Amino acid sequence: MQFLPIKSYSNIVEGNALKLNWEEIVPKEKLSYIIGNPPFVGHSIQNEQQKKEIRSIYVDENGKEYNLAGKIDYVAGWYFKAASLISNTNIKVAFVSTNSICQGEQVVGVWQPLYKRFGVNIDFAYQTFKWGSEAKDKAAVHCVIVGFSTNHNNEKKQLFSSTDKLDLVDNINPYLLSGKTIFVESVKTPICPVSPMYFGSKPTDGGYFFLTPEEKQVIVRKEPQSEKYIRKVLGAQEYINNVERYCLWLVGITPSELKSSPMIYERVKKVREFRLASKAESTRKFADRPTEFKQNAQPNKPYLIVPRVSSENRRYVPIGYIDPEVIATDATQIIPNATLYEFGVITSNVHMAWMRTVAGRLKSDYRYSSTIVYNTFPWPKITEEQKEYISKTAQGILDARALESESSLADLYNDVIMPVELRKAHQANDIAVMKAYGMIKKVNGKDKLMSETETISKLFEMYEELTSKK
């Protein structure tokens, strides 16, 4: 665009773009393009004024607020106002935006109203890239560029990858992938008959339940009767990086036992004080039960643990079985009754492809959510023979990990140094799962596994079929 940067004939209007009437500034008949770089403010860090602005904009034809209006990034306001302005015109829009509007639950919150109410169509997109800045205190911001209009045509759409590769495709969906436009909506229970997934236990304790190895040793030395109430604990970081950490697990402790353990008593007292000082009424109420985690989801049998945040540099999110004596915090998701077959499927490249597509992100790291990733995942219809075989390949992954028991999962799943046996075990499991899904195609008369793009297309088809029946 030769008119950038603006040097002359500029008409700059100062004001809040989300409160101004854009047509009063420039009639849409005079517009060909709208381009911009709106403010990057995530939904969780918006101030009250910004939240109010977004909620007042994201409304339907009757002025009713859309369900997810309170859970979308600030930049979405520019998308909505632009879509409203360009409806039934040939005007084209392009914004630099936070990549989170094309990930996880925000895809539904941001894009579904734009498609259904205004009939937008993505013309081109630049997938996630890290924002470059020369500022000394620059923040790590991951962005996308999205160009859209309401002028539907048969022209190929331009899809740029983070490596500057350009693909000409028939359609770009709101996940910024080539393929049919699908909206994966969060649900509280799985859409297929599989074991449910829950948050791990939530302490809401101000940190007073938690102990370093050194703090544990001091308590055990001075108050040996307390040792039975100290458990190993795992959040995502402890699980992935093999960090030793402990917590007080005081289920069943009697008042006399507590009084005879001054060090534990003092921590319980501080938990109570912390909860009483909370602004949340539900937390203040739980001050009357200061020996307990606020939410206890701990299973009494071995369970699968899934870290809620995992590095984008790992091909597989490290998932594994944990002994019930080890406490899982709400920095993880857990599946209490998971079979080996279920472990095999969710640790496969098929599930990982789904996760990479529909999960939200923390910066560029994956945020695994039960409601948007696990519960929406389409499982295959398989035979008992296939299920048994996947169970064997899943066990093969656990066996390969056991050969490197001294290594952390962070090291085992570092793609550069991943042990050969573990890689082979995952590949065998991937093939077994893909065959169960029928993700095989003929190429020159030979069987070949589908690519990740083809895998996602098939999963979207399955998802649409499963959810259309409900």
What feature does the model see in each segment?
Residues 1, 20-25, 81-84, 131-135, ...:
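Generic recognition of flexible, low-complexity loop/linker segments
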Residues 1-8:
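Short mixed-charge
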Residues 2, 17-224, 241-245, 255-259, ...:
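Signature of N6-adenine DNA methyltransferases within the class I
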Residues 14:
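Conserved residues in the N-terminal Rossmann fold of short-chain dehydrogenase/reductase
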Residues 38, 42, 86, 90, ...:
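A generic secondary-structure signal for well-formed alpha-helical elements
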Residues 70, 159, 244-249, 278-289, ...:
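Short coil/turn segments at secondary-structure boundaries
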Residues 120, 263-271, 286-287, 376-470:
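Non-catalytic DNA-recognition/assembly elements of restriction-modification systems
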Residues 153, 164-389, 465-470:
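Polybasic, glycine- and aromatic-enriched phosphate-binding surface used to engage nucleic acids
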